[in-house]
Structure formats: C-alpha cells, structure tokens
Amino acid sequence: MRDIRELLLVLFTSCLALGSVPSSFDGDRYCRCQPGEACWPSLADWQALNMSIQGTLVEVRPIGHVCHEPTYNKADCERVSKLSSNGTWRASQPGAQQEHAWEVSLSRNESCYVGPANPAEPCGQGRIPRYSAMVETTEQAQKAIRFARERRLRLVIKNTGHDSGGRSSAVDSFQILTQRLKDISFIEEFTPTLAETRGPSVRIGAGVLTKELYAVADEHGYTAMGGECATVGVAGGYIQGGGVSTALTPMMGLAADLVQEFEVISAEGSLVIANEFQNQDLFWALRGGGGGTVGLVTSITMPVFGAIPANISELSFESQQPDEAFWTAVKEMIYVTRDITTGGNSGQYWVGRGPTGSYFVRQTLFFLGETDIEPADKMGSLLRVLQDQEIAFRFNVTAYPRLSSFLAIPQGEFVGGIAFHQENILIPQGFYDSPEGPAQLVDRLAEVKLNPGDMWVANTLGGQVMANKDVDNAMHSGWRTASVLLVGNRIFEPALKSQLDVQERLTAVEGPLLHSIGQPAPEAIYLNEADADLENWQDWFWGEKYARLRDIKSKWDPDDLFLVRHGVGSEDWDEDGMCRMQLSPQECPVREHSRCTCKFFECAMLHVPGLL
C-alpha cells in the first residue's frame, strides 16, 4: 500500500510540476488564483510589479463607485455622469467598458451603475478587474504577462472595451490596458520580415482608435481600412475578429484579409513577429480567430490606399406606426440598396425605433470611384415609392474628392455607456439576391417587436469579400458567400433584471428567427457583434476551421492564459474563466495535462498500473 501511495504522490507532484494547471485546487477542479486565497499576490508583489513597469499599475474600481456609498462624492459623480457617454474617455478607463452589460456580474449579482439615483445602493466590483497594467511600452506588457502567468491570474486584455460578447472583462481579473500604445507610422514600401516589398502600408500600435488612424491617414493622403465607430481600437478585437468596414469592405475585403503583419506577445512573454513568412500558424489564427485568444497584439501592419473619390448619399424617413406603407417603403429601400451596391459600391441601412417610439429608416450609400454619377437617378424607384405612400423623407448627396476626408469625420464618438445587447446573422447571397429575397427578409424582421431604441443595422458585403475566397485565414467560409451582415441592437435599462430579460428575448425568441433567414443553410455569425449566449458558437463563428484554431492555441497558449468568453478553448472553463470544467476520469490523463481537471484519485485509479 505504501508503494501505491508513493506512486500517487509522484504522479500528483509531476502533474503540478508541468506548470500547465492553475495553482488552486478545490478537490474537484483546478482554478486560477482569486482574492483572499494564499496564492493571490501580496501588496508587496503588486508594488514590485508596479516598479518594474514604471508606475503604470493601478488598483481598479468601477467608474460608478463615486456615485455610491461609502465613496459617494457629488461633484465626482456629476463629472463621471457627464463623461460616461464619451467613448474615448471610456476606452481610457480601466474601470469601464463601452457597454454596461460587461461591467456587471450576473452570477454574483453585482453592479455599480453611473448616476446619483441611488447612492445608498452598494457598488459591486462586477466584471471590472482588480488591477490594471496601463502599459505604455511593449516591454511593460511583456512583464505584466509574465506576472499573470507566474501568479496564475485571470488575465484580460482591454483595448477600448467595444465588445458585445464580454471578452474584455472578467471577475477578479488582472487587466492589461493597451490604450496607450499609440504609435502610427507610414511605410512607403512595406517589407514584411523575411519578405519582399508590398507597397504603402501603415504600422499602428494596439491603442490607436479608428478616428486617430483615419485622421492621420487623411493628412498623409491615404485611405485606411477601419470600422465605422470612432472609438474602436483597430488592432484589437476589430481586426482579429474579422474587421468590417461599412465603406470599404465590398471594394477591399475584410480587414483580416488585408493585414500583413502582427507584433504579438506570447503567453511566455516573448515578442514575436507573425506574417506569411514566419510563425504562419499564429498569423493564420490572428486573422479572424478572435481578440485576446492566442497572444497580446502590440501592433499591426496593413496596407493603405490612395485617394478614392466618393459620392455619398443619405436618405431617411420616419413613421409613427409600422404600417403597410412603412414596410412597403422598407422593402423597396432594400431592393434599391441591393441593386446599387455592386462593383465596389457599398451601403448600410438602419431600421428601428427612436427614443420617442416612432419608427425610422436611415440609408447611406457609398458610390466609390465615380465622380460623375447622380445617385438620385439610381434611387428613382425608391423615391417614387416614398412619394406614392405619402411618406416624408430627407435625401442629400455629398461629393468627396477623397473618401478619407469623410472617414476622418468622427462617427459615434459619444455613444459609450449604452446598455444594449447584440445579435447578428450573415445573409447568404442565394437568399438575398433571389427575386423575393429582400421582401422575405422584411417580412421576417416585421415579426420582431422593437422597443424604443431597438434597431436593425445591415452592412453590404459581397464584392471583394467573396473574391477573397482563397485567402487562407481563420474567417468562417460563410463570409465568402454572404451578401449582407445583419445586426440587431437591443436596448435595456441599467438594471440586472432588464439585462436578463433582453438577453433571454434575444436567445430564445429572436435568435431562432434570425437563424431561419436563408434556410436551409444560413451562413455564419460575426463574432464581434454576436448574441452573448449563443449556443454552438464554435460552429457559427468558425465552422470547420475551429479544430485548427484549437490546435494552434494549444501550441502557443497551452495553459489558456489568454482566455475570452466564447473564445477558442473557453468551453474547457467555467463561465468566468476561473476554473476548468471537470472532465470524466476516462478523459483526464488520456488528454494533455492542461485539460486534466477530474478528481485526482479517480484519474489515478484508472491509470496507475496495478492500482485496481
């Protein structure tokens, strides 16, 4: 019996020595270190880290804590309340996300809302990190990553906090904030490491916002690829999740198709270059595999383009009720958009309810490379329908010698702090381009009850996205046959019950309806704007490419230091990414040790020779 015990001890200690399991063991599962546990860093440990990263470490409280006792301060609460809608400010705050939903913790019933409505209500930490390394250099980020790895901490990466899936926050976590990595440099003839020149490109730090990139690119006479919202970080989850540009994607493709090189810090704290000539597997995974999953990206390099002339048309109309006349006009608007957005032209349309309850439609079309076109001529049928239905509308066209000057005008800069959930679907070309496609789409959408503030937003795809079918990256193959990305935004009150109610509505009611569009084969779902409780997310986000992503993550991050909600490998962990899910004894030592989460003695009894 003594020999057996010694053998068990050897097996147990050797498993720990591999360094591939978190250090806390609760009898059933291996967990990361949490506050209050012996393994949690001491104050001296945090102070030592702070000194090593030049004083950029801060202890974090939710931004709303100044509006709650015992730290209530009337003046500070008023100041934070005024700043709360500023997306740029929220991006810079370690204690904030862009969306309320991912500042609170439903599992712990913790929230800390901004505003003086109820100062006596306690402020819970929620999903806001305990500490943040607000790094200013790559070297500081490397030290922070090594610290998190050695201390077995729940690590989160926040770029700007634009994240509808909860990937930028986690309970009891240690955050690395990349907002201060702001370098932008243009390269006339970019040469990827170990490669030939590729033409004009831009290298940007992880903290560069869309509005910052667009403004500097315009100053240099370039057009850059980025998203619509001014306060999104281009090099973060935007490009690593795919990267849709409202104006440029049909002409140029997805941002993940274009990116030429990543500088990334690995789970071991090493700075590596990933491009098509070195670390090709990492390069493949970073282009569509999702942000914060296989490493911390410190900079990217991507091509820039010359001046692109553009005529941009904007049309909008409203209706007090969603009657037949309203939906008739919506159908014609989609037919016209579909017919116009070919040959590199692009478009976006919104259908929703305003704060007062009225229904609205907004359409923006980008006629790119065409200077002598008359958009009104292209939209004649829609304008006639609006007149026939006696619907008042606003329509204007603006010509821009350079699209970049339009992009440099910040969009959506003051929409931070909104409480909303998202859902989306990629609509396949076969459905959308059919004679009845737009009409059937509107009939489906009309079934959904919209509350004030709710809306549908559609971006046209196709074009170069489809033409890039041979680009080898982690993007779901469904992108190559999709015509439209349709996104639903659903507003809720800043209260946990309201948040839960809206989430249940999305997942149980609206989700199945969305998934039915284009049946029997809907294409895919965009991971950057997805239902937070989506089932089978691996298939919807990546399809047949998920297995390869798992393999690459196991190679580069076997301990899952980089873990995000509904990200590669997260199914092995609990909801908060704190403890590994328990596997059956049969699965344990048969799989790699980093997945060994079953009860130790059950594993030993199965796999120690002669024990049974």
Curated annotation (Swiss-Prot):
This protein's record includes keyword Signal: yes
Pfam short name (any one): FAD_binding_4
PROSITE patterns on file: FAD_PCMH (PS51387)
Cofactors named for this entry: FAD
Residue span(s) of domain FAD-binding PCMH-type: 124-307
Biotechnology section: Notoamides have been shown to exhibit antitumoral activities. Notoamides A-C show moderate cytotoxicity against HeLa and L1210 cells with IC(50) values in the range of 22-52 mg/ml, but the IC(50) value of notoamide D is greater than 100 mg/ml. Moreover, notoamide C induces G2/M-cell cycle arrest at a concentration of 6.3 mg/ml.
Pathway listed: Alkaloid biosynthesis
Enzyme class: oxidoreductase
Disulphide connectivity of cysteines: none
Domain of life: Eukaryota
Residues in the signal sequence: 1-19
Listed GO biological process terms: alkaloid metabolic process
Keywords: Alkaloid metabolism, FAD, Flavoprotein, Glycoprotein, Oxidoreductase, Signal
Glycosylation sites: 50, 86, 109, 311, 396
UniProt entry tagged with the keyword Transit peptide: no
EC id: 1.-.-.-
InterPro entries (alphabetical): BBE (IPR012951), FAD-bd_PCMH (IPR016166), FAD-bd_PCMH-like_sf (IPR036318), FAD-bd_PCMH_sub2 (IPR016169), FAD-linked_Oxidoreductase (IPR050416), Oxid_FAD_bind_N (IPR006094)
GO MF annotations in UniProt: FAD binding; oxidoreductase activity
Free-text function comment from the UniProt entry: FAD-linked oxidoreductase; part of the gene cluster that mediates the biosynthesis of notoamide, a fungal indole alkaloid that belongs to a family of natural products containing a characteristic bicyclo[2.2.2]diazaoctane core. The first step of notoamide biosynthesis involves coupling of L-proline and L-tryptophan by the bimodular NRPS notE', to produce cyclo-L-tryptophan-L-proline called brevianamide F.
Membership in a protein family: Belongs to the oxygen-dependent FAD-linked oxidoreductase family.
Name of the molecule in the record: FAD-linked oxidoreductase notD'
Source organism: Aspergillus versicolor
Gene: notD'
